[in-house]
Amino acid sequence: MAKQKGNRIQVILECTEHRKSGMPGISRYSTEKNRKNTSDRLVLKKYNPILKKYTLHKEIK
């Protein structure tokens, strides 16, 4: 029998406000998501240490 792929996949989250600010560097987080429960792209509010505030981080491909 063939082994099935797991439902959990690893994704990378990138800050959306950081690009607009023009500051050097980038804020990224890696996390896991369940493919069956959240099929669309993940959006979380995470801390950006460069901007020193909580910002929206979206899943990148």
Swiss-Prot record:
<keyword id="KW-0687">Ribonucleoprotein</keyword>
<dbReference type="GO" id="GO:1990904">
    <property type="term" value="C:ribonucleoprotein complex"/>
</dbReference>
<dbReference type="InterPro" id="IPR038584">
    <property type="entry name" value="Ribosomal_bL33_sf"/>
</dbReference>
<dbReference type="Pfam" id="PF00471">
    <property type="entry name" value="Ribosomal_L33"/>
</dbReference>
<comment type="similarity">
    <text>Belongs to the bacterial ribosomal protein bL33 family.</text>
</comment>
<keyword id="KW-0689">Ribosomal protein</keyword>
<dbReference type="GO" id="GO:0005840">
    <property type="term" value="C:ribosome"/>
</dbReference>
<dbReference type="InterPro" id="IPR001705">
    <property type="entry name" value="Ribosomal_bL33"/>
</dbReference>
<protein>
    <recommendedName>
        <fullName>Large ribosomal subunit protein bL33</fullName>
    </recommendedName>
</protein>
<dbReference type="GO" id="GO:0006412">
    <property type="term" value="P:translation"/>
</dbReference>
<dbReference type="GO" id="GO:0005737">
    <property type="term" value="C:cytoplasm"/>
</dbReference>
<dbReference type="GO" id="GO:0003735">
    <property type="term" value="F:structural constituent of ribosome"/>
</dbReference>
<dbReference type="InterPro" id="IPR011332">
    <property type="entry name" value="Ribosomal_zn-bd"/>
</dbReference>
